[in-house]
């Protein structure tokens, strides 16, 4: 699952998704273009879940309506994220190969361990900075550039590089999500805890 601003794809790709969560939108009432895309995707088998404190026209057309308290959508997604992490509902291989979560960061500053080099933009001819990020290779037990072929990146853990402590972004994410339990989410959003778990599982 992908959560957050710009994590979603264009509506024309909705038919390829298993589930689409709609938050902060009432597209059935406000956008004929987007509502057409929603209906087409439903015909293709995509399930739509609508987060809305009221039973809006979009909630009425969705496959599932979650009537949470107004303004608590972020809390709902935080609770979902923690549940997904705790239950390991993510695609581990995809996360390792296609996200920045294995990258090493300084836990004090939140900045990635990286080398910065000067390069020239081939299109503009202007100088640009190129960053090479580091991850922990379990095969060599050392920090290596994220572009290293054949490396076995660690997804989680704490490591020492040049005498300094680093953790993976995944480790930091798990730590940051620790307070957002199902119980906290249920109380904040005024919905049953099993609703949060159900949506996260889907």
Which residues does each PLM region occupy?
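Anionic-ligand anchoring segments at beta-strand to alpha-helix junctions in alpha/beta enzyme folds, i.e.
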Residues: 1-16
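Solvent-exposed alpha-helices and their adjacent loops that cap or buttress functional pockets
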Residues: 12-15, 41-42, 58-59
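Short acidic, glycine-rich surface-loop motifs adjacent to enzyme active sites
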Residues: 17-28
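Long, well-ordered, tryptophan-enriched scaffold segments
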Residues: 56-202
């Amino acid at each position: 699952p992908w959560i957050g601003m710009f994590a979603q794809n264009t509506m024309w790709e909705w038919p390829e998704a298993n589930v689409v969560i709609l938050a902060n939108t009432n597209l059935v009432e406000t956008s004929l273009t987007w509502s057409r895309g929603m209906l087409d995707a439903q015909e293709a088998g995509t399930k739509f879940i609508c987060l809305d404190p009221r039973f809006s026209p979009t909630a009425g057309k969705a496959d599932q309506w979650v009537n949470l308290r107004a303004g608590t959508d972020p809390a709902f997604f935080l609770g979902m994220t923690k549940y997904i992490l705790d239950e390991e509902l993510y695609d581990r291989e995809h996360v390792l190969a296609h996200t920045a979560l294995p990258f090493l960061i300084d836990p004090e500053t939140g900045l990635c361990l990286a080398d910065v080099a000067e390069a020239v933009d081939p299109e503009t001819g202007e100088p640009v900075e190129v960053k090479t990020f580091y991850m922990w290779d379990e095969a060599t037990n050392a920090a290596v550039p994220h572009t290293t072929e054949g490396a076995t990146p660690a997804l989680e853990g704490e490591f020492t590089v040049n005498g300094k402590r680093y953790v993976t972004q995944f480790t930091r994410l798990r730590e940051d999500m620790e307070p957002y339990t199902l119980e906290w989410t249920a109380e904040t959003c005024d919905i049953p805890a099993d609703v949060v778990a159900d949506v996260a599982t889907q």
